[in-house]
Amino acid sequence: MSEDAGHERLLIALAQAMVDQPRATLQELAKAVGVSKATLYRFCQTRDQLVTRLMTHSAQVMKQTLADSRLDAAPTREALRNLIEQHLAHKELTVFLMYNWKPDMEMQADIMQSWSGYQETLDAFFLRGQREGVFRVDITAAALTELLITVITSMVDAERRGRIARLGIATVAEQMLLHGISAEPATAA
């Protein structure tokens, strides 16, 4: 296994451990992921450094999900399906972000720089879908971006807590985004 692949696996395990044990010390986190405290200390010397490293890594992975989803090239519905599946493939990082993101992180230039372009890419995708008539135009592209993120994070968290099964989450998320919860198509009132 390459060093990068080993670091990737360690980061994912640490992200999950930090969600499962939010107040754990570095020593407790090391034990939870099966490495020595010295190994974890060489990787990150403080908990704050670990959070920053995980935030930056999560941003890189999430931005790669956008590229892998082929948002510009694939047909819009297929791209949406790809986007959901790509995000679900990295559910440990999604949950880590959900539990560890704080509004003051937007003041940290290094973290925000790593996220540069993420929302804008999603906004552009939803705008393309609106122009093609796939997505509603009475909801802004920015709002659709926020809805996508909310649906994915809430479904991943519900699975983590045992409320819903993993099977079918992608389909549920896609159907919610495309059709909402209405049993019938909306009619003009």
Language model features: what each stretch is:
Residues 18-23, 41-52:
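HTH DNA-binding helix-turn interface
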Residues 4-31:
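Short, amphipathic alpha-helix enriched in basic
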Residues 33-34, 45:
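Central "turn" residue of the DNA-binding helix-turn-helix
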Residues 1-8, 185-189:
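N-terminal intrinsically disordered/low-complexity leader segments
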Residues 38:
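Key DNA-contact positions within bacterial/archaeal DNA-binding proteins
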Residues 53, 64-92:
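Hydrophobic alpha-helical connector segments
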Residues 99, 112, 131-175, 186-189:
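Hydrophobic/aromatic-rich alpha-helical bundle segments in the mid-to-C-terminal region
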